[in-house]
Amino acid sequence: DNLGGNLRIIVSAAAPIDAKVGKWVEDIGIKFLQGYGLTETAPIAALTPEYEPSRYASTGMAVKDTDIKLKNVNDAGEGEILIKGPTVMLGYYEDEEATNEVMEDGYFCSGDIGRIDSDGFIYITGRSKNVIVTQNGKNIYPEEIELMLGKIPEISECMVYGKKESEDAHDKELILSLIHI
């Protein structure tokens, strides 16, 4: 009632949100849904079904007539998210080269890394362009570290990124964190 009594649903999109936020929204009596999409998917590709119990860390399931699959899946079950459906773009205007870089057999290669559970719910875990590759070849996504740091009560904001010591391909990649307390 403090919000006017008519607000039934809040939809979040753009980036994974802390599960505590979704739970809080539902605790005050408002259904919390998450969506996933990009400009190239006009704009939604996945959404939490309203009738499903919330899975706060998930961006939902593929919307009607849309197929979402993973490419180059690693041992953790994560891979690049590919999207195909009637709302996926035909291509970038007058830029066939850029179009060919992101389209594969009718699927749009999002650049987002995620996993899909056995029920079809999608979980975004990072961006392929953000990946930090350690000396032993392990892939680390800054977003995962940010989520862990965000659970520390004394940290109000943080940002994690990778930076090479120099342009030499053999140099180490450093993991840097900016933390606001």
Predicted regions and their residues:
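Short polar/acidic secondary-structure junctions
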Residues: G37-L38, E50, V73-D75, E165-E167
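Gly/Ser/Thr-rich phosphate-binding loop
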Residues: D1-S54
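Conserved beta-loop-beta connector loops within the AMP-binding
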Residues: D67-K84, V102, R115-D119, E167-H170
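Thr-Gly-centered strand-to-loop micro-motif
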Residues: S12-A13, Q34, L70-K71, I83-K84, ...
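Conserved ATP/PPi-binding loop(s) of AMP-dependent carboxylate-activating enzymes
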Residues: A62-V63, N74-E101, K138-I140
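Short coil-to-beta-strand transition motifs
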Residues: G60-D65, F108
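Conserved ANL (AMP-binding/adenylate-forming) active-site segment centered on the GW(Y/F)…HTG consensus within
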Residues: P53, V88-G111, E146
